[in-house]
């Protein structure tokens, strides 16, 4: 097939200069063209000839190539697609230039509209000439009977990652003369959709031809059949009328909801509609739970009864959904409602201007309701400034003035809200039928859990252990129970639940678990939103019991503090602790004699083990439970985090804040636990996308680790980051929530890095004024200049095998009572060594020193390895 040459000449922009694309590398990428059937090849030839006539492509001899293919649309016509994924990987992506869809209720009430659509916007915007060879493709010839015809795009191709952003920037630049010529005109732009709005129709009639002329000069043409000139029109999926905005009718189909991808699309549509809907977030949770589980887009999902009921609520709400157009001369208010589980808010001016909802998946396991209201109010204030350019004059919340003062004194979120909002805070809602949906909910304010001990309340001490034994002490009586749990926190929660059910009178609870104390204090006015969490069910039961009982005071006492157990707050806790550890269970004469021996001689754990045929763990527990012996136990070294025995085995990662870096204050830090090599990235946030960016930068510099340990931050536990780790074949582990000791190595690295930034700033501030440069200098010092006791830097340790003891030992297999060795020591630890067992035969059946093995290992360094 030979294309016909055409001179029809697609006229690229007469004014606009093509924007160059930033590239990571200039190396050509060649992906061979896929095989196409004769039917598809014929369609490709026809579509390419059309693009050639329109001037969208040129013949090419580019060293780049990526495949093209065609798909048949429902109408029966073919669509040409270009697989540009390899090219997208080579380019630096532009940042977002538009934060989201414009809120149409911000359009003034009663103004006239003109709505237009730019025709073939991508194909009207030129590519920079130096970038065009990268977007080349090939039309294969049948049976290779002639050279293949090759072409490259002259305009923005579909499928290029930067095409949407470049389109927005290009059209925005083309509209600048219109904005300057008619400053009183409201002009909304989203991709290729444009809305003009003005109070006077004559002004629109003057602006419209000027707009057409300007767009034409930039090579942009409008679709004349889609122009809407009226006070009512369709724009961005909504019907805009003089006094209200109504979403277009959306049909929710249920027959195709079978996979995760189906639900992702459905929930995307619902999320787009949420500003129109007054449905509280809690009523949509059965739908958003479908996003959990298997992350593969084709993983099966089944529509449940609760999810179907949620869809029915959405359909019912859509029938009456509308937003009011704002009246510029009138003020508006922000109303925050006490809806079930999580609050709901609305910007109000004789009707809803914009519904505001909290995040469907909060970062915390327990959301305290008063804090959730303050956070949503702050979100509403930000939305008012963003979309309407001014703050509401009135904030309406479900709390009295006295309650607001109490919350401002005890809650950080309320303190920020009260000090940042200059208007009036009230609790009287407008009288309107739309707002009646929230009036049936009771005001959520803490009344059961008090902040001071109850003088007339009984005192109960609780404790739980990892053996599943939970106990509480009341009036000197010890009650213990075995639970089917192996987590001390879970057992402690179950014990507290048992106490709340048993003692209905005013109650003081003393627990040695700070986690449980904080949880109980939050649960009366909070909500657990993690159905996948094991503790969520227990929290819900505790919450139900709290809401139907007398006041409770719960406090924390530190266990094993070394203080005399005669102290009032410690005697009961000591009894509960002994009950969970077996200290109160000695009853037989033999056990009594053993206790006398223990309390008299205080011998070592090894002696107890040999004397009473105990295991090592049981013997050590006896020593640690002894009040006299525990004071003299060896203190473990602070560096108890698991470390890799060689580089790239175990990394730790965390985020610290350096306020002097400004917008780049979120400093992501990774450290290799074996070599100590450190990498840091100053970024603008700490979301999953920022964490992934840091990982890619760190791994490209120092290599990819096998295991990555982080804390339980929302970015690290997100589905997006978990999927990234699986794709990169990196095992991701998290530590205990709210326990930074599990990431002690990277926490110490934070302090070290900040120390060097401060020290070097004094000497190098004039030479290295930029934050990135000062950070690089600190990392260079830590990685390449600082040496250990052996004279090695972190970079040298990272790039070489760690030194191992050159020793051989014999060792005994206690299961078979046989001695083996001598075998080499891999690594020494405190009280133990790791030995590499060189077995007599290998997994391949060769003898240890056989000729076959010698042939297989020829040229391989003589280091221990598994065979």
Swiss-Prot record:
Mg(2+) 1 binds at residues 117, 192-193. Residues 52-240 form the Reverse transcriptase domain. The RT polymerase active site binds 2 magnesium ions. Residues 807-862 bind DNA. Mg(2+) 3 binds at residues 654, 711. Its EC number is 2.7.7.49, 2.7.7.7, 3.1.26.4. Reverse transcriptase/ribonuclease HThe reverse transcriptase is an error-prone enzyme that lacks a proof-reading function. High mutations rate is a direct consequence of this characteristic. RT also displays frequent template switching leading to high recombination rate. Recombination mostly occurs between homologous regions of the two copackaged RNA genomes. If these two RNA molecules derive from different viral strains, reverse transcription will give rise to highly recombinated proviral DNAs. This is Intracisternal A-particle Pol-related polyprotein. It comes from Mouse intracisternal a-particle MIA14 (IAP-MIA14).
């Amino acid at each position: 097939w030979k294309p016909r040459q055409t001179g029809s000449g697609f006229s690229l922009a007469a004014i606009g200069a093509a924007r160059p694309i930033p590239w990571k590398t200039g190396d050509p990428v060649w992906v061979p063209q896929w095989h196409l059937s004769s039917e598809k090849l014929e369609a490709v030839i026809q579509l390419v000839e059309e693009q050639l006539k329109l001037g969208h492509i040129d013949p090419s001899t580019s060293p780049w190539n990526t495949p093209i293919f065609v798909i048949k649309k429902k109408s029966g016509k073919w669509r040409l697609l270009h697989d540009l994924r390899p090219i997208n990987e080579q380019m630096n992506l532009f940042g977002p230039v538009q934060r989201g869809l414009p809120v149409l209720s911000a359009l003034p009430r009663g103004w006239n509209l003109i709505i237009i659509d730019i025709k073939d916007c991508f194909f009207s915007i030129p590519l920079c000439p130096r970038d065009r060879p990268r977007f080349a493709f090939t039309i294969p010839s049948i049976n290779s009977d002639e050279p293949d015809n090759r072409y490259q795009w002259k305009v923005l191709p579909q499928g290029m990652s930067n095409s949407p952003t470049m389109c927005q920037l290009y059209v925005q630049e083309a509209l600048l003369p219109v904005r300057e010529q008619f400053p009183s005109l409201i002009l909304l732009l989203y991709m290729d959709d444009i809305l003009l709005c003005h109070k006077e129709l004559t002004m629109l009639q003057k602006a419209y031809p000027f707009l057409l002329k300007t767009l034409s000069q930039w090579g942009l043409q409008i679709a004349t059949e889609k122009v809407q000139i009226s006070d009512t029109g369709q724009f961005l999926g909504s019907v805009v009328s003089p006094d209200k905005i109504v979403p277009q009718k959306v049909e929710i189909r249920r027959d195709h909801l079978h996979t995760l991808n189906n639900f992702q699309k459905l929930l995307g549509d619902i999320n787009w509609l949420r500003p129109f809907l007054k449905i509280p977030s809690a009523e949509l949770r059965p739908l958003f739970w479908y996003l959990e589980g298997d992350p593969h887009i084709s993983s099966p999902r089944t529509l449940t009864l609760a999810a179907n009921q949620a869809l029915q609520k959405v359909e019912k709400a859509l029938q009456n959904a509308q937003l009011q157009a704002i009246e510029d001369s009138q003020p508006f208010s922000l109303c925050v409602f006490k809806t079930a589980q999580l609050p709901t808010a609305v910007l109000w001016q004789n009707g809803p201007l914009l519904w505001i909802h909290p995040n469907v998946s909060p970062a915390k396991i327990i959301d305290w309701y008063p804090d959730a209201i303050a956070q949503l109010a702050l979100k509403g204030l930000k939305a008012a400034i963003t979309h309407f350019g001014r703050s509401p004059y009135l904030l309406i919340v479900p709390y009295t003035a006295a309650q607001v003062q109490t919350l401002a004194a005890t809650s950080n979120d309320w303190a920020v809200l009260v000090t940042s909002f200059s208007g009036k805070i009230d609790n009287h809602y407008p009288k309107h039928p739309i707002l009646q949906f929230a009036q049936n909910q009771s005001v959520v304010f803490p009344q059961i859990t008090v902040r001071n001990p109850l003088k007339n309340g009984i005192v109960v001490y609780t404790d739980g252990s990892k053996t599943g034994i939970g106990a509480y002490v009341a009036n000197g009586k010890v009650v213990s129970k075995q639970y089917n749990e192996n987590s001390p926190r879970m057992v402690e929660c179950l014990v507290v639940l048992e106490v709340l059910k048993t003692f209905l009178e005013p109650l003081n609870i003393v627990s040695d678990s700070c986690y449980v104390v904080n949880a109980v204090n939050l649960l009366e006015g909070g909500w657990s939103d993690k159905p996948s969490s094991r503790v969520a069910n227990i929290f819900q039961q505790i919450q139900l019991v709290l809401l139907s009982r007398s006041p409770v005071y719960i406090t924390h006492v530190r266990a094993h503090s070394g203080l005399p157990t005669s102290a009032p707050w410690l005697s009961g806790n000591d009894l509960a602790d002994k009950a969970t550890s077996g200290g109160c269970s000695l009853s037989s004469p033999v056990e009594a004699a053993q206790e006398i021996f223990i309390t008299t001689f205080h011998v070592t754990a090894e002696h107890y083990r040999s004397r009473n045929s105990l295991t090592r763990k049981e013997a050590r527990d006896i020593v640690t439970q002894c009040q006299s012996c525990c004071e003299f136990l060896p203190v473990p070294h602070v560096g108890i985090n698991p470390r890799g025995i060689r580089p790239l085995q175990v990394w730790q990662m965390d985020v610290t804040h350096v306020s002097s870096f400004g917008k780049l204050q979120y400093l992501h830090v990774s450290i290799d636990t074996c070599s100590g090599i450190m990498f840091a990235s100053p970024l603008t946030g700490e979301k999953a996308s920022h964490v992934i960016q840091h990982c890619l930068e760190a791994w490209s510099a120092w290599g990819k680790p096998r295991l990555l340990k982080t804390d339980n931050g929302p970015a690290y536990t997100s589905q997006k980051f978990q999927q990234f780790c699986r794709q990169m074949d990196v095992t991701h582990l998290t530590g205990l929530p709210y326990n930074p000791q599990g990431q002690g190595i990277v926490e110490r690295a934070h302090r070290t890095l900040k120390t060097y930034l401060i020290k070097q700033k004094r000497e190098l501030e004039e030479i290295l004024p930029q934050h990135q440069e000062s950070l690089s200098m600190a990392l260079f010092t830590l990685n390449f200049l600082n040496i250990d006791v052996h004279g090695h830097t972190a970079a040298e340790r990272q790039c070489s095998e760690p030194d191992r003891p050159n020793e051989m030992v014999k060792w005994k297999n206690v299961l078979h009572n046989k001695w083996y060795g001598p075998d080499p020591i891999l690594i020494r630890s405190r009280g133990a060594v790791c030995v590499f067992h060189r077995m007599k035969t290998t997994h391949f059946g060769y003898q240890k020193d056989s000729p076959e093995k010698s042939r297989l290992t020829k040229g391989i360094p003589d280091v221990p390895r598994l065979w």
